């Protein structure tokens, strides 16, 4: 039993060491064989746009509402993941698991109602 565990640790250690060696080797080769940039040329830093000189600022300033919507999406997507996992073991969970799922969904739905009430999901500004 101990020999099997020891062999597994050695295999894992060899894997980690070889991964580190491979990373160091790739980084070293790219440093040695890569292009040296001695003179800063402005035209090399511009993105290629089919031969047309770029116009305007390439940085987009997005509203914070986009980030909020993305965070809400991730939260409710995780809710769907948990409900899917719960639905696959619903027979083993029994009534207690059913009540726990109802509590879970009700907490999340109350959070959604709260977000709607404070206006976090509104896209238009408030005109008072």
Curated annotation (Swiss-Prot):
Its main location: membrane. Keywords: Cell membrane, Membrane, NAD, Quinone, Translocase, Transmembrane, Transmembrane helix, Transport, Ubiquinone. GO terms for cellular component: NADH dehydrogenase complex; plasma membrane. It is found in: Cell membrane. HAMAP family: NDH1_NuoA. It is a multi-pass membrane protein. It is an enzyme of class 7 (translocase). NDH-1 shuttles electrons from NADH, via FMN and iron-sulfur (Fe-S) centers, to quinones in the respiratory chain. The immediate electron acceptor for the enzyme in this species is believed to be ubiquinone. Couples the redox reaction to proton translocation (for every two electrons transferred, four hydrogen ions are translocated across the cytoplasmic membrane), and thus conserves the redox energy in a proton gradient. Belongs to the complex I subunit 3 family. Its EC number is 7.1.1.-. It comes from Baumannia cicadellinicola subsp. Homalodisca coagulata. It catalyses: a quinone + NADH + 5 H(+)(in) = a quinol + NAD(+) + 4 H(+)(out). The gene is nuoA. This is NADH-quinone oxidoreductase subunit A. The chain crosses the membrane at residues 12-32, 66-86, 96-116. One of its GO terms (molecular function) is NADH dehydrogenase (ubiquinone) activity.
């Amino acid at each position: 039993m101990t020999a099997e565990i020891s062999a597994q640790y050695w295999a894992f250690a060899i894997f980690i060491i070889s991964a580190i060696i491979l990373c160091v080797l790739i980084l070293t080769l790219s440093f040695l064989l890569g292009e040296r940039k001695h003179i800063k040329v402005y035209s090399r830093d511009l993105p290629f746009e089919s031969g047309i000189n770029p116009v305007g600022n390439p940085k987009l300033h997005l509203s914070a509402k986009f980030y909020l919507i993305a965070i809400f999406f991730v939260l409710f997507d995780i809710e769907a993941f948990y409900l899917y996992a719960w639905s696959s073991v619903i027979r083993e969970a029994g009534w207690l698991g059913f009540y726990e799922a109802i509590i879970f969904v009700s907490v999340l739905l109350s959070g959604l109602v709260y977000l709607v009430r404070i206006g976090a999901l509104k896209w238009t500004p408030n005109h008072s």
